[in-house]
C-alpha cells in the first residue's frame, strides 16, 4: 500500500494527517499503480440470469432531457444498441463470453461509447445505460453509496472515448475494479 510505505518515512504530525487523508484514496492509488504496470486483476464479479431488454433501453433513452436540445440526439444507426445488447450476452460453448454482471456492464459502457451507435449523444446515452444496467442488476449501490459517483462516471466515459481500441481490455478491467 503506497500510503503505508510513505508513512514509515515521515515523523511529524502534519505529514501523518496528510497521509491519513491519502490513505482514504489507497484503492485509487493502487489501481493507478496496477494500471501503470499493466497488472490489473479482473475481479470475479456477480452472476445473474436476468437480461436487460432492448425496448426498455429505448424507452429510457426516449425520456432523456437531452432529447429536447437536439433533433438528432439518440437517433440509432442500424439498430446498433440492439446488437450491443446481444453481444454482452453472447455465449460460446454454453458459457457466457462476458462472465460476470460487472464485465457485461463494463463492456456495455465501452461498446456504446466506442461503436457510435447513435447519430448524437453516444457518451450521454452510454453513461445513462450503464447506470440503468447497474441498477437493473442491483449493483449500483453498495452499503448505501453509489459504486460509481458522478465524477467517476464522467471520467470513465471520457476515458473510453479518448482511448485507443488496443487498450480495451485494460480499460474494462479498470472499470470492473471500480465496480468491485
Model-assigned labels for residue ranges:
Residues 1-180:
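FIC/Doc superfamily catalytic core
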Amino acid at each position: 500500500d503506497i500510503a503505508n510505505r510513505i508513512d514509515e518515512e515521515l515523523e511529524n504530525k502534519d505529514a501523518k494527517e496528510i497521509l491519513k487523508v491519502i490513505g482514504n484514496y489507497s484503492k485509487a492509488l493502487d489501481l493507478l499503480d496496477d494500471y501503470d504496470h499493466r497488472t490489473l486483476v479482473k475481479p470475479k464479479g456477480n452472476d445473474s440470469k436476468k437480461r436487460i431488454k432492448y425496448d426498455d433501453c429505448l424507452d429510457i433513452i426516449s425520456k432523456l432531457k437531452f432529447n429536447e436540445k437536439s433533433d438528432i440526439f439518440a437517433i440509432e444507426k442500424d439498430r446498433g444498441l440492439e446488437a450491443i445488447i446481444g453481444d454482452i450476452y453472447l455465449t460460446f460453448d454454453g458459457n457466457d463470453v462476458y462472465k460476470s454482471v460487472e464485465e457485461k456492464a463494463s463492456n456495455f459502457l465501452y461498446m456504446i461509447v466506442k461503436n457510435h451507435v447513435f447519430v448524437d449523444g453516444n457518451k450521454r446515452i452510454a453513461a445513462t445505460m450503464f447506470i440503468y444496467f447497474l441498477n437493473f442488476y442491483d449493483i449500483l449501490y453498495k452499503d448505501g453509496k453509489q459504486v460509481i459517483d458522478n465524477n467517476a462516471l464522467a471520467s470513465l466515459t471520457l476515458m473510453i472515448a479518448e482511448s485507443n481500441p488496443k487498450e480495451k481490455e485494460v480499460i474494462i478491467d479498470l472499470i470492473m475494479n471500480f465496480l468491485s
